[in-house]
């Protein structure tokens, strides 16, 4: 049975909660996308840079509210990294999904937000996108700096990796067959073109690459989330 995964979501939630799923009972097949979190404010916000937002946070501890799609999802991971690296006293507001989190920022219900690059790029006319939580700038937003360029040492651990998986115990020949076919399917010109037309970043990874990524995220998130629930 094929299923879709979203990392860091399922890994973070398996660390914090007593879930029935974790990286030990799932087998990755291949990865098709990697959608970074971006730091956004409303189009009428007085803040134009990460530095300006953090200066306001320093002067007003706890007053800078930042929305995200929920708890222990990519946006929340980006927030935790941002707060830790900047040392700022910030308040996270978990929404009931990415669309609601985006709406909060547009409506001025929160000072800022972390949201998907794909969704934010489609709503760019209603937002200011201050920074990307990734190791490099993105081709869809070439003028938007990374958080590291903005002086905050946040890496790519919150990037939403998306792909396909099967349950552990699936016959190895089935896993091998799917792993040999699925990444090629994701890389087809029509598929990549469709993703690009919706500002959905593609990142094609084979099974071995996904296994390595899962293990890296498991180790990092176990440390980041220690003591949180």
Regions found by a protein language model. Give the residues of each.
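Short acidic active-site motifs
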Residues: 100-101, 209
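C-terminal lobe and pocket-closing loops
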Residues: 118-187, 216-219
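Conserved beta-strand termini and adjacent loop/short-helix elements that scaffold enzyme active sites
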Residues: 5, 69, 93-98, 115, ...
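Extracellular/periplasmic bilobal clamshell ligand-binding domains
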Residues: 206-229
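Conserved functional loop/turn residues at catalytic and ligand-binding sites
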Residues: 49, 108-109, 126, 151, ...
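Mature extracytoplasmic/periplasmic domains
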Residues: 183, 187, 191-212
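Hinge/capping helix and adjacent helix->loop/strand transition within the periplasmic-binding protein
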Residues: 1, 13-100, 147-149, 161-194
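A ligand-binding cleft/hinge motif common to bilobed small-molecule-binding domains
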Residues: 7-17, 76, 81-85, 107, ...
């Amino acid at each position: 049975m094929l299923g879709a995964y979203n990392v860091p979501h399922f890994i973070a939630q398996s660390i914090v909660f007593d879930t029935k799923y974790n990286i030990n009972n799932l087998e990755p097949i291949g990865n098709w996308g990697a959608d970074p979190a971006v730091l956004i404010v409303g189009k009428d916000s007085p803040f134009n840079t990460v530095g300006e937002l953090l200066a306001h946070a320093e002067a007003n501890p706890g007053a800078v509210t930042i929305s995200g799609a929920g708890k222990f999802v990519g946006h929340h991971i980006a927030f935790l990294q941002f707060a830790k690296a900047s040392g700022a006293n910030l308040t996270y507001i978990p929404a009931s999904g990415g669309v609601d989190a985006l709406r909060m920022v547009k409506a001025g219900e929160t000072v800022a937000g972390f949201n998907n690059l794909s969704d934010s790029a489609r709503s760019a006319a209603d937002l200011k996108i201050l920074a990307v939580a990734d190791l490099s700038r993105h081709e869809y937003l070439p003028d938007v700096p990374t958080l590291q360029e903005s002086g905050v040492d946040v890496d790519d651990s919150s990037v939403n990796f998306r792909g396909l998986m099967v349950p552990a115990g699936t016959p190895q020949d089935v896993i091998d067959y799917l792993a040999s076919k699925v990444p090629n399917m994701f890389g087809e010109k029509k598929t990549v073109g469709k993703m690009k037309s919706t500002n959905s970043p593609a990142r094609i990874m084979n099974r071995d690459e996904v296994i390595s990524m899962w293990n890296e995220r498991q180790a990092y998130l176990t440390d980041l989330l220690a003591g949180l629930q």
